[in-house]
Regions:
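Feature captures the catalytic ectodomains and active-site-proximal regions of enzymes
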Residues: 1-225
Length: 225
């Protein structure tokens, strides 16, 4: 499967970036799709939650728990390609800027410009910077209190949030794929993500949730000296 997919990427990946954003084929298409949703929304408010490092199979685990904790939650799912190399600093900045990586060479190796890029994107769509909110480093604590410290309900139109709990679990994992699924399940059962989504919906936001990249089990080379 990996061999076939690699061959497909060589032939087709370069053509994905210029496809229309109606059904986002790549992560930098996502904000432009949000613009369309905002225009069609009764409240004119959108919220984007980026779960750092969440793989597709782990999303299945997350989805099942979200639906169990909130039986009224309605979801639509689609698949989107990350940017290669699938690094946080590359793909996540593409998400928040709405642009391919070639447009942010000076910050390609870090994520400190995400908030600025997110604000610039929405200013380009006619919003004031006061209508835009961004916060990263989420995943623990009281989701409602955290959200209320970031946004002004009824005023903030575009919300960008980074949940990095799964990425932290991944970088500390020593028990492989099974350990990842188990810890992600335990974290989800704590209810942070469910509360975050529910409160955004209660405030009238259309909520999108995506990952910037996934993760895969591999054999390392030990701890370098």
């Amino acid at each position: 499967l990996n061999t076939a997919f690699a061959a497909w990427l060589v032939d087709h990946y370069s053509s994905l970036m210029n496809l229309p954003p109606t059904n986002p084929a790549m992560l930098h298409h996502v904000p432009r799709r949000l613009v369309r949703d905002m225009e069609d929304s009764a409240n004119g408010q959108v919220a984007l939650i980026v779960v750092d490092g969440l793989s597709l199979d782990q999303w299945v685990t997350v989805r099942q728990i979200l639906q169990k904790q909130n039986v009224h939650l309605m979801m639509r799912e689609s698949a989107t390609f990350a940017w290669i190399p699938t690094l946080t600093s590359v793909s996540r900045q593409s998400i928040f800027s709405g642009k391919p990586p070639l447009y942010f060479p000076s910050s390609i190796n870090c994520t400190n410009s995400e908030g600025k890029l997110w604000t610039q994107f929405w200013e380009g769509q006619g919003l004031s910077r006061l209508d835009v909110a961004y916060q990263r480093g989420l995943g623990d604590g009281d989701a409602i209190d955290i959200l209320d410290s970031v946004i002004h309900p009824g005023k903030t139109k575009a919300v960008g949030l980074v949940v990095d709990k799964i990425d932290k679990i991944m970088h500390g994992m020593q028990l492989g794929s099974a350990g990842m699924h188990n810890q992600i399940k335990q974290w989800c059962q704590g209810g942070f993500l469910t509360s975050l989504v529910a409160q955004l919906l209660a405030y009238g936001y259309d909520v999108w949730l995506t990952a910037d990249h996934g993760n895969i089990q591999c054999n390392g080379k030990g701890r370098p000296l």
